[in-house]
Amino acid sequence: MENHEPDGTIIKENLTDIIARKINQLPEAERNLLENGSTYVGLNAALCGLIANSLFRRILHVTQARIAAGLPMAVIPFLTANVSYKGFVSLPLNTGDLQCETCTVTRGGLVGLVFGGLYPVFLAIPVNGGLAARYNSALLPEKGNILNYWIRISKPVFRKMLFPILLQTGFAAYLGSRQYKLLIKALQLPEPGLEIE
């Protein structure tokens, strides 16, 4: 018996190769946006993380360990948003699995909202809470009131972070739309090496 690959795998590889060749025909600026769009979403997520970190540090009166708290608040949201945008939007677009502009915009917006906006704010809570407990900079609650305390502390931060979160969501959705249009433009280009008479 011979080991054969299913026909779908061969078609998928050919489709991926065709899309990659077409993308390489785009001008450099457009190709850069198509290939590195997830990095821009990650940079915005890192900025949201630093803003949330700063707001929680002010509320909890934490003045020590600026770099120790700022570094993970920039790096972790950057990596998370970058990888999730690449996995949910860029990779499916480049492999032909995502073929609907509305789906691309929705996926991009959701990744921007969850991983680029909300996740950095939620990540700032334990980071700065741990620093406040370590340096005794704020009066922390008793065991029974922990949830109410963090909800009360987080409300003003979420109000102030509303604009950056919405901006991140809108930016990621716009980027998804732009990448979809660039991919359609690339697919309409003639095959390299073919001469049209």
Swiss-Prot record:
Localization per Swiss-Prot or TrEMBL: Mitochondrion inner membrane
GO annotation, cellular component aspect: mitochondrial inner membrane; mitochondrion
Topological region Mitochondrial matrix: 1-35, 80-107, 178-197
InterPro entries, A to Z: TMEM126 (IPR009801)
Keywords carried by this UniProt record: Membrane, Mitochondrion, Mitochondrion inner membrane, Transmembrane, Transmembrane helix
Transmembrane segments: 36-56, 59-79, 108-128, 161-177
Keyword NADP: no
GO-annotated biological processes: mitochondrial protein quality control; mitochondrial respiratory chain complex I assembly; protein insertion into mitochondrial inner membrane from matrix
Membrane topology of this protein: Multi-pass membrane protein
Mitochondrial intermembrane compartment residues: 57-58, 129-160
Protein family according to the UniProt entry: Belongs to the TMEM126 family.
Subunit-level organization: Interacts with OXA1L; promoting cotranslational quality control in mitochondria.
Record's function text: Protein required for the cotranslational protein quality control in the inner membrane of the mitochondria. Associates with newly synthesized polypeptides and may act as a chaperone that cooperates with OXA1L for the insertion of newly synthesized mitochondrial proteins into the inner membrane. Required for the assembly of the ND4 module of mitochondrial complex I.
Protein name: Transmembrane protein 126A
